[in-house]
A protein has these predicted regions:
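HhH-family (HhH-GPD) DNA N-glycosylase catalytic core used in base-excision repair
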Residues: 1-175
């Protein structure tokens, strides 16, 4: 809502490749999801395809009549989540629920933490690695310097920016 995409396009136009990318995909925006919804949905997305992710999230929302909070899911166990058919991800969801609700993950302070500290905080959850943490930080905590990298992004970076991203993206790498 408060992102000045015009200013970002101006900054990115300093780099020829990024300027072309902005012209090609100028309508893409970063969602501002609820932080728990972002964390749990990116846990569900691990090593998964979009139709299956949609199915798991659909079953979760149907069961709870909407997207549940961590508090709503407080009594869930690996066995009780069997209806999701999420496989190994169920144990990661349960661990996330437990760590968020117990305060072991300082969920309320993540937004104020520096990026590396926030990433490390989320990575205390079983199954949360750098990509899931960065996706959660970008979409759920609006940390625009978080830059989720899957295999495809890594390949593009290796091809186009082998020496690192240009300075015009500093602080907004995730956008």
């Amino acid at each position: 809502l408060n992102t000045d995409y015009g200013e970002l396009k101006r900054r990115f136009s300093e780099n020829e490749t990024l300027s072309k990318a902005c012209s090609f995909a100028g309508g893409i925006r970063i969602l501002r999801q609820d932080s728990w919804e972002a964390l749990s949905s990116f846990i569900i997305s691990q090593n998964n395809n979009i139709p299956r992710i949609k199915g798991i999230i659909g079953r979760l929302c149907e069961h709870y009549s909407g997207y549940p909070s961590a508090e709503d899911m407080a009594d869930e166990t690996i066995d009780s989540l069997a209806y999701l058919r999420s496989g190994f991800r169920a144990k990661y969801l349960v661990d996330a629920i437990e760590k968020v609700l117990s305060g072991e993950i300082d969920y309320q302070k993540i937004k104020e933490m520096p990026l590396d500290d926030a990433r490390n905080e989320l990575m205390k959850i079983k199954g949360v690695g750098p990509k899931v943490a960065d996706c959660t930080l970008l979409f759920g905590f609006y940390k625009t310097d978080a830059f989720p990298k899957d295999v495809w992004v890594k390949r593009v970076l290796a091809q186009w920016y082998p020496n690192g991203l240009p300075s015009c993206v500093k602080g907004v790498e995730g956008i």
